[in-house]
Every structure is written in C-alpha cells, then in structure tokens.
C-alpha cells in the first residue's frame, strides 16, 4: 500500500481569505493567526488576498465566487458567531457551515470552515489565540495540506 501525504509548505500556493467585520475584535485575531501561519509555512504575502464581508452569513457566497475564479488553491473562511438569546445563532451558524461545505464540494476547491461557533465571547477569544491556539492559523494549515494533497492527486 502506498501512503500519500502532503507537505505543509505554502511556497507555490495562492489563497483567498474571507473574514467578517462582525465580531471584529475576535475575527481580527483569527486573521492575524491565518496570515502568520501562511507566511511561516513559506507563503508569500502577495499570494494571500483578504476579502471582508459584513457577517458570517455572507461568507459562503463570496467564498464560492472566489473558488469559482480558479485563481486560488484554497479559500479560508473566518468569522465568529456567538450564541445569544434567540434562534438567530442557529440560522447564521448553520447557514455558514452548510454554505462553506457546499462551496468546497461544488467547486472542488478546498474551503476552510474557520468560523467560530461559541456560547460566549470568552470561548471565542480563547479560540482566537488567547488560550486554545488560533483557529485561523489552524484553518490555514489544513488548507495548505489539503491543497498540496489535491495537487499530488491531480499529477
């Protein structure tokens, strides 16, 4: 059996980063983690395009348009949806998750779900780099590996 693994090198990769303005104090940290991970793994800043959208519900549409251009090896989606007192959280978080998954499956371009879905602001901040690592950086690493694996499959 042949085992095929991808590298975590972003030298020749071009990524689109889609982030939300909503909950920007949290999302800005995710973006910083994503940019740092991309550069630390050999990516060039000019190969990382950053697109801002109002909120997490708008992320899938922009991610899909970017994936369909064929200009990007992967799209990284970052946002934060924090539970409140109404059902709004369920619709936004579910819509974002389903839309991002469908974008990846429809286009064949890897699309990372880096949208935090938490009960509290504290949980979100912890996942944005304060205590539990930076989920923005983790999303980029997953896309570097996935994009490189797809390149190997296509050879």
Curated annotation (Swiss-Prot):
Protein residues bound to 5-amino-6-(D-ribitylamino)uracil:
22, 56-58, 80-82, 113
What are the EC numbers? 2.5.1.78
The pathway this protein participates in, as annotated, is: Cofactor biosynthesis; riboflavin biosynthesis; riboflavin from 2-hydroxy-3-oxobutyl phosphate and 5-amino-6-(D-ribitylamino)uracil: step 1/2
Q: Is this entry keyworded NAD?
A: no
Q: Write out the GO biological process terms.
A: riboflavin biosynthetic process
Q: Which residues bind (2S)-2-hydroxy-3-oxobutyl phosphate?
A: 85-86, 127
Q: What class of enzyme is it?
A: transferase
Extract the Pfam families matched here: DMRL_synthase
Question: Which PANTHER family does the entry link to?
Answer: 6,7-DIMETHYL-8-RIBITYLLUMAZINE SYNTHASE, 6,7-DIMETHYL-8-RIBITYLLUMAZINE SYNTHASE DMRL SYNTHASE LUMAZINE SYNTHASE
Output this protein's name: 6,7-dimethyl-8-ribityllumazine synthase
Organism field: Deinococcus radiodurans (strain ATCC 13939 / DSM 20539 / JCM 16871 / CCUG 27074 / LMG 4051 / NBRC 15346 / NCIMB 9279 / VKM B-1422 / R1)
